[in-house]
Amino acid sequence: MRLYKSVRLASITSTWADELIGWKQEQLDNELKNGLLERAESQLLKEFPFLNGISRNISFKVSFSSVVELCYRTTEKYTVNDWENTAKEMENYKNTSDNETSNTPKLYLEDSIWNGLENYQRKLMGENNKRILRLSYIIKLVLFAGWKE
């Protein structure tokens, strides 16, 4: 199941997401030229024969939410030490973008990914923190880690 949640994010987070969207969209466009849609429809009919006689409309879209999911899955096996190093690297990253406004995208993510991000809030908070880390920071960190991969 998927859930919508709105999370206020820093502008640099959108910059990284936009770069990832462009990169992933380029991959998708190449795959579509090579028959991805036809292969997906054939595979779907093979897996679910009852769909024979039913119109199938498949669309593929790269979005802010889909790249958050990509980055989460890419970094899922990170250790706490990996995250600490990534956080330090992110803090030292120099933002060359002039855009300083934040945005509040409505993210549409799988339950398991929301749960994983929320678990990171506690897991990465450190011994000196009195409160859990903000979800916006966790998403920023996950996107940075995926962006630098």
Describe every region a protein language model picked out.
Residues M1-E47, S55, A87-Q121, M125:
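Short Lys/Arg-rich basic patches
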Residues N30-T86, E127-E149:
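Short, basic amphipathic alpha-helical segments that act as recognition/interaction helices
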